[in-house]
Amino acid sequence: MDPVAFKDVAVNFTQEEWALLDISQRKLYREVMLETFRNLTSLGKRWKDQNIEYEHQNPRRNFRSLIEEKVNEIKDDSHCGETFTPVPDDRLNFQEKKASPEVKSCESFVCGEVGLGNSSFNMNIRGDIGHKAYEYQEYGPKPCKCQQPKKAFRYRPSFRTQERDHTGEKPNACKVCGKTFISHSSVRRHMVMHSGDGPYKCKFCGKAFHCLRLYLIHERIHTGEKPCECKQCGKSFSYSATHRIHKRTHTGEKPYEYQECGKAFHSPRSYRRHERIHMGEKAYQCKECGKAFTCPRYVRIHERTHSRKNLYECKQCGKALSSLTSFQTHVRLHSGERPYECKICGKDFCSVNSFQRHEKIHSGEKPYKCKQCGKAFPHSSSLRYHERTHTGEKPYECKQCGKAFRSASHLRVHGRTHTGEKPYECKECGKAFRYVNNLQSHERTQTHIRIHSGERRYKCKICGKGFYCPKSFQRHEKTHTGEKLYECKQRSVVPSVVPVPFDIMKGLTLERSPINASNVGKPSELCQSFECMVGLTLKRNPMSVSNDGKPSDLPHTFEYVVGHTMERSPMHVRNVGNPSDLPRTFEFMKGHKHT
């Protein structure tokens, strides 16, 4: 009976037939073929003096022995006379196809590959064959350690590839299209698409691939298949790498940290993009005006300003925008949605850029320094604007009158003088203004008029108190909620003699002041700390001559001040040289003032 080979029992598909199978069918095919291969491997083993049941349960061990036999056969045919190292257990994996890059084969070793059955399951063991004695290799510690994600590697080439992934270095370029890659193997895989020699060709675009896995991944672009689904939010992705990066938005993991400013990122692409900001590198240039950008996406958005191609149009106001992010931010202006909230002060924003700019106010971070004067700024745009004060550059010019400006925002504001646009409208009277400063000045005038008329539009729903302006009303509301947003960072400061909460001090206006003469005899709304000051009027003033000798109702601190009349004053001319009957009040007050 002839021996059974793997090709006799294997089921082979053509490229067209394979493309018709779905994911579950392809997975089932692989499992069946692997199981068949394991069974054939175990049948081809010599069973003399061995436990058959044990050997059947360990097909990997059988496969290893079979490969050793093949290697020994090839070893006998080699011409250099060297001995070779067998493949260790941990390197024999059915799905492992990578060879160890550290071991070099002999020049006269003409083995090529060890083929077992179908080429789909062939294993390249050239990398695991070395010029050493016939003994097992001990795979010890991993000497190459990557500093950024704290990952260790056994071989230096793998370490260098990982290192380039962080630094963004891509020394290998495609000669046809100029695209750069981290490794030589990536260039070779890429060149297959240009040559069209790959065994797997895409039906939709004609691209060729040398690997079935890459072909199937590429196919998802055309079919729209997204097998990788996020369990937390349900969002699906075409690629597992994109899915892994998305999962970090839920976990908050940011493994790529830039050492210069300490900012961390979810993906290496975001890390490299941020690195270009610090380096000042702008590799992507507009072909029409020559303006350079750090990211190719920004170039595409900028090119729409030349072609006047606005893809996104607002249905409410008709305004057209060139980018999706700008359009989404604009829509929030109409809806009032502000999804980005500051955790420190509670202020919310409609765009992520505005939110990030605001965050730097709390952190005090100013990573951008002017090289000429040393002044630091929290944003790169602020630094660029400041540098123009040194150079005198005014790149933004008005097309109608020719006037030039340092920033685009100043040019937009100036353009309203020509168009007559007045975007800032008063909510109370409907009057419109060209500048926001004019609107604020107008609102202050309206508040001032109400003070004279006595009108109080803003009333508290809890206590019914009325206010002239909305800001005073908002401050008052915090007294009911107990909200205190502003906290003193220096906790070692000596407290005042009379500790008064900030919300009580806000009520110290002239109309409710206990010092005012018109409020004499009226009950004060302030706390007990100021109850003693109600009596500080002219008729009960302890410093007045008419009150000399009368008992004071002030606290113990001011008891010694009762004797401070003109006739008994130690500063009076008639009392010069006379011993004062006052205690050391001033020494006490002087020392208290310094503390």
From Swiss-Prot:
Designated gene of the protein: ZNF440
Source species: Homo sapiens (Human)
Keywords, comma-separated and alphabetical: DNA-binding, Metal-binding, Nucleus, Repeat, Transcription, Transcription regulation, Zinc, Zinc-finger
Pfam families per the UniProt record, alphabetical: KRAB, zf-C2H2, zf-C2H2_4
Function, in words: May be involved in transcriptional regulation.
GO molecular function: DNA-binding transcription factor activity, RNA polymerase II-specific; RNA polymerase II transcription regulatory region sequence-specific DNA binding; zinc ion binding
Zinc finger residue extent: C2H2-type: 144-166, 172-194, 200-222, 228-250, 256-278, 284-306, 312-334, 340-362, 368-390, 396-418, 424-448, 458-480
Gene Ontology BP terms: regulation of transcription by RNA polymerase II
Xref: InterPro entries: KRAB, KRAB_dom_sf, Znf_C2H2_sf, Znf_C2H2_type
Similarity comment: Belongs to the krueppel C2H2-type zinc-finger protein family.
Designated name of the protein: Zinc finger protein 440
Subcellular location: Nucleus
Residues annotated as domain KRAB: 4-86
Entry GO terms, CC: nucleus
